[in-house]
Regions:
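DNA major-groove recognition helix of helix-turn-helix/homeodomain DNA-binding modules
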Residues: 12, 26, 43-61
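Recognition helix of helix-turn-helix/homeodomain-like DNA-binding domains
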Residues: 26-41
Length: 79
């Protein structure tokens, strides 16, 4: 799963603003902001945002044992 911190990091890594991500995921800018603040979103909305970021080359990682999380950026996304 993706959390709000990962969303913000992924968006920054891609050089996207809140508006670009919102438009790509067909959600409001307020929805993206709420996610990045740590508020709960409906599963379908969260999945839509995550899928857009994954299609742009982001891989979400998390370590269940200690709660660590982050992102990976596929090399092909850095062109």
């Amino acid at each position: 799963d993706m959390n709000g911190h990962q969303c913000r990091i992924a968006r920054a890594a891609l050089g996207w603003g809140v508006r670009e991500l919102a438009e790509a995921a067909t959600v409001s800018t307020q929805t993206v902001t709420r996610l990045e603040r740590g508020e709960e979103l409906r599963a379908a909305t969260l999945d839509r945002i995550r899928k857009v970021l994954e299609e742009a080359g982001i891989v979400f990682i998390s370590e269940e044992n200690d709660g660590s999380f982050g992102i990976l950026i596929k090399r092909s996304s850095l062109t």
